[in-house]
Amino acid sequence: MRRFLLLYATQRGQAKAIAEEISEQALSHGFSADLHCVSESEKYDLKTETGPLVMVVSTTGTGDPPDTARKFVKEIHNKTLPTDFFAHLWYGLLGLGDSEYTYFCNGGKVIDKRLQELGAQHFYDTGHADDCVGLELVVEPWIDGLWPALTKHFKSLGGQEDMSDSDTLAQASDAPLSMAMKPELLHIQSQVELLSLEDVGKRDSELQEQNETNKNQPSRIEDFDSSLVNSVPPLSQSSLSIPAVSPEYLEVYLQESLGQDENQASVPPSVDPIFQVPISKAVELTTNDAIKTTLLLELDISKVEFSHQPGDSFNVICPNSGSEVEDLLQRLQLADKQAHRVILKIKMDTKKKGASLPQHVPEGSSLQFIFTWCLEIRAVPKKAFLRALSDYTSDATEKRRLQELCSKQGAADYNRFIRDASVCLLDLLLTFPSCQPPLNLLLEHLPKLQPRPYSCASSSLLHPDKLHFVFNIVELPSNTTAASLRKGVCTGWLATLVAPFLQPNTEVLTADHSDALAPEILISPRATNSFHLPDDLSAPIIMVGPGTGVAPFVGFLQHREKLQEQHPDGNFGAMWLFFGCRHKDRDYLFREELRHFLKTGVLTHLKVSFSRDAAPEEEEEAPAKYVQDNLQHHSQQVARTLLQENGYIYVCGDAKNMAKDVHDALVEIISKEAGVDKLEAMKTLATLKQEKRYLQDIWS
């Protein structure tokens, strides 16, 4: 068996799932994948590795490698390593990213570049998969091309590797096809099953007959346009190439609960310390007629060891919506068993390599707890999940549609009706009523419910033992009922939690409602980042934060104000804030507080943009619609701050549009004011980022 080392670096499980898919496909191509997380350094050794290396690397934050790869990246960036340290190593790398972020696929690019600097060579070209348009558009063909690339690599080494009898038989059965085709076309033997309506085999013969019958009957769908449940030609008449079904590997037993005192998990598992803290204050920062509702919450951290500084972020551990969990269990016909304990075991005869129990499902927890606190039931189902669901769908039309949505031919429909529409499992089960998946399938495919990150919006110097954060209540259209809106998993939960004592925005600075009933939430620290005030207090800084992106900068300003009080003779650099919102009178967050900082001189320049109002007349506000416009209105000062005064620029907020537009504006500013072309301006920004003088805290 031809062995290769397969490493993944994952943040939320995406890279791991893709690596597992590669591992499962490897056997059918005569390869053996030695699969490990890159953090499991005790299980592999690149210094002595003789086989080819395949890596799948995701990206997190603002272009950083995932947390699981931090140690690995640090080790390979040791400056004492010689340039031929990995000269023996041949590798192929698949990077995952999102082009909505400035530093697309940077986690993979960092590792790729460093491996080459240390002498490693590609046996297969690097792939960059974009979650913005659909990872599968690159992932699937990259995996398809991996097998001929590995085959070519092993042939170039000469000789045949040892194989077991079963492996030899497997290869022999493939020999006619292999010999009849060029090596670069061998990927046709990959994991896909060619499901032709003319040649589907005995198991699907009844479905084929039903499909033929359905063609001659009136459609039960009024809308003849393509939709989640309905396809149109040519897709509806095409033969389909669909993924091979992933081997099931879990056995699930439901054990009747012995009573409420029975020992079970009360907190979802986490590698980070978890703190239970009360919400001491909740303030609505926007007016009732604002397009988005923004809340400020204050946490009382006086009883826990939770240190933080302005610019830090932290995680809120949140549950799924109780009503959604109830609806899902009802649809799965498990509502009467929601208090039962879930016992998991690995199937004795599973074909899944390296099968293990999901670490995010605590042993002996109730069914309701698992679906409420452990599983991301809002996750958009991947194609492998759709493929598995199709096997448990009895209606021929519904089964065919699920197969279309996970097929190569149905990629456009998948993106439009599943991915872009943020369809979740409950949506699918309500749309395809004959789909009756077993519980083990859901536990195998639903990912871990992730904590939600929030920026600290306060300074411990001004608010000791308190922690502020700000968020918009996210509203999403529901795919199950046309008129309803779903709230964000975490923001909707928090809004409901604080509704009984939510205060209007009268005076954020001094209002205190700690005497109200204080619900408690779970929080955990996040890995430290560099989004902090510079150590050199005399360095000028530019802060760009529209909407809730202003949150960390309020903490910056609070911190700076207290430092100036403590050091009245200190040399403090200028502070610019570029803030933006829709309406001056509806969603101008922290308006009075920002004006206070401007009046006291802590904030040197406040430039505010109102995208939906007529041009403002007040002196501190420039007539620009967006923060990037305001930056360009002050291009000379911005360029001087960054290029001549060794200043810092911080950008916080939406990655999809704002962060890109701000980046483009900075390129134009540097190009114009420094008299260089745009390529040189981009290099200058890259240098600023490397020097940690251009810092981003952005989200999608």
Curated annotation (Swiss-Prot):
Entry-linked SUPFAM superfamilies: Ferredoxin reductase-like, C-terminal NADP-linked domain, Flavoproteins, Riboflavin synthase domain-like
EC number(s) on file: 1.16.1.8
Gene Ontology cellular component list: cytosol
Positions carrying Phosphoserine: 173, 190
InterPro entries registered for this protein in UniProt: CysJ-like_FAD-binding, FAD-bd_FR_type, Flavdoxin-like, Flavodoxin/NO_synth, Flavoprot_Pyr_Nucl_cyt_Rdtase, Flavoprotein-like_sf, FNR_nucleotide-bd, NADPH_Cyt_P450_Rdtase_alpha
Annotated region (Hinge), positions in chain: 168-247
Domain (Flavodoxin-like): residue spans on this chain: 4-147
PANTHER family membership: METHIONINE SYNTHASE REDUCTASE, NITRIC OXIDE SYNTHASE-RELATED
Name of the protein described by the UniProt record: Methionine synthase reductase
Species of the source: Rattus norvegicus (Rat)
